[in-house]
Amino acid sequence: MTAAAADELHTIIDLIRYGTSRFNEAGLTFGHSYDNALDEATQLVLHSLHLPHDLGPAYGQARLLRAEKERVLALFQRRVDERVPAAYLTGEAWFAGLSFKSDARALVPRSPIAELIEAGFEPWLGGREVTRALDLCTGSGCIAIAMGHYNPHWDVDGVDISDDALALAAENKARLHADNVSLLKSDLFTGLAGRQYDLIVTNPPYVTNDETDALPQEYSYEPELGLRAGDDGLDLVLKILRDAPQHLSEDGLLICEVGESEQHLIKLLPEVDFAWVEFKVGQMGIFAVECRELIAHSARITELASAR
């Protein structure tokens, strides 16, 4: 951004407004933690100034030093020129009310599952007791760590195939003192022999090949391993549905995010009673399904999964 801009902009609000305008003008893509230019510009300004993310509006008229303005504008410039997701620029993403370290070793935390965690997974758990929970495809560890944070009596496993993702998850575990969370390397369930859980939560890769190839530049900074999942986005989901009953208690529950691949799943398995979760903003491609329901339809699920 130009030196002239630094001369004309004076306050926190000035910079937030300017960043919002530039981001919209540049046609940036949002969706990594924030879904609009205003919130993302606010995040970048507050981070640059070492201010809390929930800073009150009374500080909006605070005037800035020239060096502070230049630091903010440099971050804006990178966001526009390089299309780097804001969370990777700041190294931080908020999920379920918690601050996570975020970098290119794993997807930016953004799953709507955060809303379920904060609601105690009700009404889907129906008051049933949980002592052991699994976050399959844990990535940054955000789901596992948030589950452990809000449920200190649970023992939570976070599992991923990526060494890079697990290293980031370990840093987040230490950052948030998640002592009841264990991190394990496994290709889905293959390394979890003998482990059973009352609740399995998973946000696996579910983006179709065509969608992955057409994603905006912002997504190119994320590991493709966490996105691409075959022609219909269900290559991993079907394997999870097949194998989950071996690792769920008799009264266990699976919660899975499939995003835009929801319709593909419904067409493949119309007989399965998937309970599609309604969020504050509507359905987001996340379902809950009982262990006994997966067992009842295991033959068809196994047939589909084996064809992948």
Swiss-Prot record:
Species of provenance: Xanthomonas campestris pv. campestris (strain ATCC 33913 / DSM 3586 / NCPPB 528 / LMG 568 / P 25)
Taxonomic path: Bacteria, Pseudomonadati, Pseudomonadota, Gammaproteobacteria, Lysobacterales
Listed GO biological process terms: methylation
EC identifiers of the protein: 2.1.1.298
Family stated for the protein in its record: Belongs to the protein N5-glutamine methyltransferase family. PrmB subfamily.
Chemical reaction(s) catalysed: L-glutaminyl-[ribosomal protein uL3] + S-adenosyl-L-methionine = N(5)-methyl-L-glutaminyl-[ribosomal protein uL3] + S-adenosyl-L-homocysteine + H(+)
Gene Ontology MF, one: nucleic acid binding
InterPro entries: DNA_methylase_N6_adenine_CS (IPR002052), HemK-like (IPR004556), Ribosome_uL3_MTase (IPR017127), SAM-dependent_MTases_sf (IPR029063), Small_mtfrase_dom (IPR007848)
Keyword Repeat recorded: no
The name this protein goes by in its record: Ribosomal protein uL3 glutamine methyltransferase
EC primary class: transferase
GO cellular component: cytosol
Gene: prmB
Function noted in UniProt: Methylates large ribosomal subunit protein uL3 on a specific glutamine residue.
